[in-house]
């Protein structure tokens, strides 16, 4: 018989830097999960990733105090800022453009994000990422 699910916990944790302090500790402690076990498993799973890159994770908590977790791809805004070499997006994206991205850069980001996007193909994924880039005040070359 399948385990009874008591809840889902969604967090964004820097790769390789999960520790019992907030927000991880309180979120897992409320459900009675082993915090250190999660931290060790998450840090081991993100060891190959760039340290400090925020990774969204969905933790499934079961009634027997066990858990599983699924890691998602980093947020598109983080990947776009990294590709453009920016600290933050534009405060007024319509008038104040802060950077420029090429189609090749957008394709690379779209390939990274593809498992989490609902796009039918790579071109649709690129257009989705281009929309995010425009809303951050980035100029996009080669995408309609």
Curated annotation (Swiss-Prot):
It comes from the Bacteria. One of its GO terms (molecular function) is large ribosomal subunit rRNA binding. InterPro entries: Ribosomal_uL11 (IPR000911), Ribosomal_uL11_bac-typ (IPR006519), Ribosomal_uL11_C (IPR020783), Ribosomal_uL11_C_sf (IPR036769), Ribosomal_uL11_CS (IPR020785), Ribosomal_uL11_N (IPR020784), Ribosomal_uL11_N_sf (IPR036796). GO terms for cellular component: cytosolic large ribosomal subunit. Pfam families: Ribosomal_L11, Ribosomal_L11_N. Disulfide bonds: none annotated. One or more lysine residues are methylated. Keywords: Methylation, Ribonucleoprotein, Ribosomal protein, RNA-binding, rRNA-binding. GO terms for biological process: translation. Transmembrane segments: none annotated. HAMAP family: Ribosomal_uL11. PANTHER family: 60S RIBOSOMAL PROTEIN L12, LARGE RIBOSOMAL SUBUNIT PROTEIN UL11M. Belongs to the universal ribosomal protein uL11 family. Forms part of the ribosomal stalk which helps the ribosome interact with GTP-bound translation factors. Part of the ribosomal stalk of the 50S ribosomal subunit. Interacts with L10 and the large rRNA to form the base of the stalk. L10 forms an elongated spine to which L12 dimers bind in a sequential fashion forming a multimeric L10(L12)X complex. This is Large ribosomal subunit protein uL11. It comes from Neisseria meningitidis serogroup C (strain 053442). The gene is rplK.
């Amino acid at each position: 018989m399948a385990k009874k699910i008591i809840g889902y916990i969604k967090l964004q944790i820097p790769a390789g830097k999960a520790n019992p302090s907030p927000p991880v500790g309180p979120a897992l402690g409320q459900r009675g999960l082993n915090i250190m076990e999660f931290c060790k498993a998450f840090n081991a799973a993100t060891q190959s990733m760039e340290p400090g890159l925020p990774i969204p994770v969905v933790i499934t908590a079961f009634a027997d105090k066990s858990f599983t977790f699924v890691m998602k791809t980093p947020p598109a805004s983080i990947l776009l800022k990294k590709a453009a070499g920016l600290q933050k997006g534009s405060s007024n994206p319509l008038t104040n453009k802060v950077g420029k991205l090429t189609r090749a850069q957008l394709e690379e980001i779209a390939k990274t994000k593809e498992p989490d996007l609902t796009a039918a193909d790579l071109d649709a994924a690129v257009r989705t990422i281009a929309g995010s880039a425009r809303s951050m005040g980035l100029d996009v070359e080669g995408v309609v």
